[in-house]
């Protein structure tokens, strides 16, 4: 075998071992289904465009020959009522999930963009299991919020402001909350009680799984923004109904 053939064989072998991204929403729908996407326009929304997961969801639904209705959180109930048939799925921005859940009938599947990112980019079962660690936080526990991109923080930034505030309100504990941005992901994760990872929309599934495996190897639970927010808002079990194995993993972890 010549050097060129050897090199091609190595590249082909490596390519087969690299985990590919899963569909964000395409695995939950079929041709002809209707999906309601809830995309709030707030201070964190980019001017004149949608954020990447929202664009990705729309494209996947078009590729699946499904129909999508894009609304803000104050039009969910009205939009569902106007449909001739109930939507196959409602997918919302995590920050408005409690409001959307209140407007969505219980028999309509509900999820969030970030939870679907956990499915697409990482391992939603393992991250759901990690979410249970939030229920056992105590005073002085260290929590690490991990972001894969270095965006400019907003006035009411979700990772630096909202999640820490909601976490302290929910637990009533004096928590030490830190933020790691981009490549500043610690080698030693053992000081932390739990890791809260962003959706990872700008990185590959391989990158997210590397982080998840590093946490697992050190026995440190990892969850993500969407799972965390849904837990803090009291709707986690409902939004995990789309992923029964993840729901079971979360419930089992709570009882340990």
Regions found by a protein language model. Name each.
Residues 161:
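A solvent-exposed beta-alpha-beta segment
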Residues 172-175:
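Short beta-strand/loop segments at the ligand-binding rim of alpha/beta enzyme cores
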Residues 4-157, 166-168, 181-194, 202-217, ...:
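C-terminal-of-GTPase-core extension/linker across diverse P-loop GTPases
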Residues 177-179:
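Extended, compositionally biased non-globular segments
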């Amino acid at each position: 075998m010549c050097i060129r053939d050897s090199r091609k064989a190595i590249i082909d072998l490596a390519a087969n071992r690299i985990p590919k991204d899963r569909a964000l929403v395409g695995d939950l729908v079929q041709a002809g289904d209707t999906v309601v996407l809830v995309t709030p326009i707030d201070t964190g929304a980019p001017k004149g465009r949608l954020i990447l997961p929202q664009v990705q969801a729309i494209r996947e639904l078009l590729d699946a020959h499904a129909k999508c209705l894009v609304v803000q959180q104050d039009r969910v109930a009205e939009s569902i009522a106007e449909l001739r048939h109930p939507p196959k799925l409602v997918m919302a921005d995590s920050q408005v999930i409690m409001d959307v859940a209140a407007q969505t009938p219980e028999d309509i599947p509900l999820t969030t963009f970030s939870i679907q990112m956990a499915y697409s980019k990482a391992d939603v079962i393992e991250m759901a299991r990690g979410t249970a660690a939030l229920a056992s936080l105590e005073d002085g526990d260290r929590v690490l919020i991990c972001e894969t991109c270095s965006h400019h923080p907003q006035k009411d930034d979700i990772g630096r402001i909202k999640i820490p505030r909601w976490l302290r309100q929910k637990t009533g504990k004096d928590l030490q909350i830190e933020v790691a941005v981009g490549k500043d992901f610690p080698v030693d994760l053992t000081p932390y009680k739990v890791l809260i990872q962003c959706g990872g929309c700008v990185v590959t599934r391989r990158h997210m799984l590397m982080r998840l495996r590093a946490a697992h190897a050190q026995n440190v639970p990892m969850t993500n923004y969407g799972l965390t927010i849904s837990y803090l808002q009291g709707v986690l079990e409902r939004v995990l109904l789309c992923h029964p194995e993840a729901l079971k993993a979360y419930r089992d972890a709570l009882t340990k």
